[in-house]
Amino acid sequence: MAGLFYLGGRDHNKQDHHQEKDHNEDKSNNYLYLYKDEIYNNNKGFEIFPPQYFQQQQQQNHAAAPTNLYSFGMVPSGGNINNNRSTNRSLYFNVVSDHEPVRSSTGGFTVTRQGNMNCQDCGNQAKKDCPHMRCRTCCKSRGFDCQTHVKSTWVSAAKRRERQAQLAVLPAKRIRDANSRGGGDDDDDDKEDEKNDSCGGGSALACTRVVNASSSGLETSHLPPEISSPAVFRCMRVSSIDDEDEEYAYQTAVSIGGHVFKGILYDQGPSSDHHRYSSSLNGETSHQHHLNLMDSTPSAATTNAVTAVNTNNGSIDPSSLYTAVATPFNAFVAGGTPFFASSRC
C-alpha cells in the first residue's frame, strides 16, 4: 500500500492543545487522510506531511464555519496508472461534523468502482442520477420520494420472445376471424342450400354434390364433360338411421374413361316437381330431361333390373321388382359395362 497518510487527533499532545485553545481555536481542525498513489503517479511509501501542508490546503478551500472532518480510505497499491483490473476498488468512510448546533453529524459508507456509483445500503450499482445514492430497491424500501427510480421498462429475453411469438400469430388470427365473420356467412348458407337440394330434404343415406362438369381438372384426367350411355339400375330397399320408414332406391355402376362410377338414386317425389337440367358442351343451350324408369323388356323383371330410356310408356312398381328375385343379378350390363354388386344387397 502506497500513498499519503497523515495522522492527527484532538487528544494529540493534550498539554499543547489546552495551552493554545483560547488563542488558536480556528486552527484546531485535525485530519486523517489516505491518498491513493495513482493520483500523484508515484510509488512512494507512507509520507508524513507537516501541519503547514494542511493549513495551506485549508486556506485554498472555501471559507466556512469551523468543522471537524475525518476521512479514511483504503485502496490496493498499484504501480501502473492504466491498470483497470476489477480488483482496483476503493473503500471510503467519511464522517463530517460541524460545531454549529443546527447541523447534525452525518455518516455514510460507500463502496465504489471506477466510473460507477454503488448503493450505500446493499452495495449494488446505484442509479446514476439518484440523489440518495441508492439502488431502486433500497430507495423504495426506505420510502424516498425519488423521481429517478421510475417503473422499469426492461423486459427479460424470455418475455420478449413470448411477446414476439404472440404478435406474429395475431395477424393471421385476425384474418381468419374476419373471414369467418365476414363473407363466410353467405358461402356457408349457399353450401347448406346446395346440400339440402342434393339430398332432397328427405331421409337419405348419402348425398351427392354435383359440380360443373366443364370445370378445370377434366382435361388432366381425360374424362369427358358429358356422356350418354345405357345403364342398368337395380332396385333396393333402404332405410335411414333417423327414420324407421323404408323406401326404395336404385343402384347402378358405369365405366367412364377407364374409371368405375357407381351410386344410389333416391326417390325425390313426383317427376313433375323435380327436373334435371343439363348443359351442352358449349354452354349456350340447356335442355330439360325427365328420367322415367321403364319396363322395356320382360327380362327386366327376371333380372331385377330396369333399363333407363327416354320414352313415356309408363312407370313400373319398384316393389314388384324387388320381390321378384328369381335369378342372381348379372355381373355385366349391356355394352360390356361392368357392374359391381354392393355387399349390402
Curated annotation (Swiss-Prot):
Keywords: Activator, Auxin biosynthesis, Auxin signaling pathway, Developmental protein, DNA-binding, Metal-binding, Nucleus, Zinc. Disruption phenotype: No visible phenotype. It holds the Pfam family DUF702. Residues 119-146 bind DNA. A motif (Required for homo- and heterodimerization) lies at residues 256-259. Residues 7-28, 168-200 are annotated as: Disordered. This is Protein SHI RELATED SEQUENCE 7. The gene is SRS7.
